């Protein structure tokens, strides 16, 4: 499984396509963020927690794009910690 722009749009109930490039950039950044936070060498895409963390983080960034985002949502941190435990 891999999270797609359409998955994010469905979750956020977005019907327009104007924001697709922005959502894709958030999605790419979220994948890198979670991967780097856990392990640069492990393939995390086999874990459901990876997709969930990527989806949550992408949605968070999209919904809060005009605010100062200093904290990663607790749920994302929880998924990252679970992934770290799974690969150790």
Q: What are these language model-derived features?
A:
Residues 1-88:
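Divalent metal-cofactor coordination and adjacent catalytic microenvironments
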